[in-house]
């Protein structure tokens, strides 16, 4: 270790090395995480590649602004428990973000070593820190918390709700988290497949939160099993972290044919099936032996592609309307999908699902990239006369999600914007306070469908806003 720690050129002598990955042929048959854990010496060597830049771009690109160079140094020195403590100062779910964040678009994408040497494996080290610390018996230190008589109801046990609960409980405010699902995590548990995030990770995190003092009321849907007004009466404040679940339609003919599936319904039903939760057997969709076309280019589309592979689909093709460089998801996930047998059709825009009584194919047109849109991405333009039909037995549509406001929002004075998102500005009198002063909100239902880590950040910031509101 001494020789390594004194080596200022570790980033040259030791190249970027990701954790060992299971062979594609093996993992394509398993709903299990595909990366092996880092060995301690490998994690330390990779962490020591960090240059400790005076202006750490990785830290600024991270939505929760993790103290990345600092905990990399602690790992390189073997100080895992200190690294875990530091990691949890900014992130409520570091072991989750280490697994599911698109680091190539965030921290690792801005690493100085990208130019010629390969970025530090920040995400893998982040995962290693918390997994190892928990295995060593580490738990968040709650010994200095002074408990108040305040309690806050949180609707949604996804990343935003858990981030909010984390901030509140560490400051002596009792969080009670309600969720319609039987386990915590929201789409972390019921949407993201186990080859990216094994569900034991969230089970462990639930136990940790409960030890800290967070109370969970699971299998309870507010508005169905309990009136929202009851929460307003019984709690000092309420946080909404209900996510975005509404399917974005393609708007083309044939979308209602048998054999066309909504991405989220498909993924949730598969997770329920794998975990053995009691649901309507008709909800589960097996694509075994079928020619599958997945429409979309984000991480949800990759989850659908790779799930279909594991179900034994005859073939899986992902069709996306822009080129590969413009895909919105993680490049790592695209590479994993390709290794596992997914084919890609780029610059293809769907115009109709073909079939009489069920899906027989998907009609697409070729596109070329034109002028940038309002987000700076080149718009796909249709190439005239380029229609073709891709044969298919099943089509999965993964175009993203929209907010689905609850019927009681208007009743309690929660205002929405033109896209159906809850108005809860970060820069308001209290961070993420809605138009009802007692109600706060954050995550996808405020910003629109986005990353896990941004939801964690907004939940934590809303927690700080609630503390200010309660004068704690």
From Swiss-Prot:
GO MF terms, alphabetically ordered: 4 iron, 4 sulfur cluster binding; glutamate synthase (NADPH) activity; metal ion binding
UniProt keywords, alphabetically: 4Fe-4S, Amino-acid biosynthesis, Glutamate biosynthesis, Iron, Iron-sulfur, Metal-binding, NADP, Oxidoreductase
Induction, per UniProt: Up-regulated at high salt concentration.
Family annotation (InterPro entries): DPD_II, FAD/NAD-bd_sf, FAD/NAD-binding_dom, GltD-like, Helical_ferredxn
Gene3D superfamilies referenced in this protein's UniProt entry, alphabetically: Alpha-helical ferredoxin, FAD/NAD(P)-binding domain, NAD(P)-binding Rossmann-like Domain
Positions of the 4Fe-4S ferredoxin-type domain: 41-72
Keyword Transmembrane helix: no
GO biological process per UniProt: L-glutamate biosynthetic process
CC cofactor note: Binds 1 [4Fe-4S] cluster.
Top-level EC class: oxidoreductase
Pathway in which the depicted protein is active: Amino-acid biosynthesis; L-glutamate biosynthesis via GLT pathway; L-glutamate from 2-oxoglutarate and L-glutamine (NADP(+) route): step 1/1; Energy metabolism; nitrogen metabolism
Cofactors that this protein relies on: [4Fe-4S] cluster
Function description: Catalyzes the conversion of L-glutamine and 2-oxoglutarate into two molecules of L-glutamate.
Protein name as catalogued: Glutamate synthase [NADPH] small chain
Organism for this UniProt entry: Halomonas elongata (strain ATCC 33173 / DSM 2581 / NBRC 15536 / NCIMB 2198 / 1H9)
Organism taxonomic ancestry: Bacteria, Pseudomonadati, Pseudomonadota, Gammaproteobacteria, Oceanospirillales
């Amino acid at each position: 270790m001494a020789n390594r720690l004194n080596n200022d050129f570790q980033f040259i002598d030791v190249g970027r090395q990701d954790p060992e990955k299971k062979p594609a042929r093996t993992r394509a048959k398993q709903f299990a995480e595909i990366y092996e854990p880092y060995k301690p010496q490998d994690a330390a060597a990779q962490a020591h590649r960090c240059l400790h830049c005076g202006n750490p771009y990785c830290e600024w690109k991270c939505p929760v602004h993790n103290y990345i160079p600092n905990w990399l140094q602690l790992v390189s020195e073997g100080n895992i428990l200190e690294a875990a403590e530091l990691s949890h100062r900014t992130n409520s779910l570091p072991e989750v973000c280490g697994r599911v964040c698109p680091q190539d678009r965030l921290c690792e994408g801005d690493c100085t070593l990208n130019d010629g040497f390969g970025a530090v494996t920040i995400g893998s080290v982040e995962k290693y820190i918390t997994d190892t610390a928990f295995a060593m018996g580490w738990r968040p230190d709650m010994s200095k918390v002074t408990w108040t008589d305040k309690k806050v109801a949180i609707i949604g046990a996804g990343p935003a709700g858990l981030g909010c609960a984390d901030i509140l409980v560490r400051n002596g405010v009792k969080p009670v988290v309600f969720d319609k699902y039987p386990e915590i995590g929201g789409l972390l548990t019921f949407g993201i497949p186990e080859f990216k995030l094994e569900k034991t990770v969230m089970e462990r995190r639930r136990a940790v939160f409960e030890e800290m003092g967070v109370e969970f009321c699971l299998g309870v849907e507010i508005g169905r099993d309990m009136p929202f007004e009851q929460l307003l009466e019984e709690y000092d404040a309420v946080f909404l972290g209900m996510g975005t679940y509404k399917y974005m339609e393609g708007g083309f003919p044939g979308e209602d044919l048998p054999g066309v599936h909504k991405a989220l319904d498909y993924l949730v039903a598969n997770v329920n099936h794998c975990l053995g939760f009691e649901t309507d057997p008709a909800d589960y969709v097996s694509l075994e032996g079928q020619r599958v076309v997945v429409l979309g280019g984000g991480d949800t589309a990759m989850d659908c592609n790779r799930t279909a592979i594991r179900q034994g689909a005859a073939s899986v093709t992902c069709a996306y309307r822009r080129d590969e460089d413009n895909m919105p998801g993680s490049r790592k996930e695209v590479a994993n999908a390709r290794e596992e047998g997914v084919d890609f059709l780029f610059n293809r825009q769907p115009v109709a699902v073909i079939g009489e009584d069920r899906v027989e194919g998907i009609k697409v047109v070729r596109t070329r990239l034109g002028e940038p849109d309002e987000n700076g991405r080149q718009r796909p333009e249709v190439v005239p006369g380029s229609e073709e039909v891709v044969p298919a037995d099943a089509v999965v549509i993964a175009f993203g999600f929209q907010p689905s406001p609850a019927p009681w929002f208007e009743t309690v004075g929660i205002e929405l914007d033109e896209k159906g998102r809850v108005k809860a500005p970060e820069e308001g009198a209290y961070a993420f306070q809605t138009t009802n002063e007692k109600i706060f909100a954050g995550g996808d239902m405020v910003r629109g469908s986005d990353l896990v880590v941004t939801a964690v950040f907004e939940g934590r910031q809303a927690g700080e806003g609630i503390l200010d509101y309660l004068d704690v």
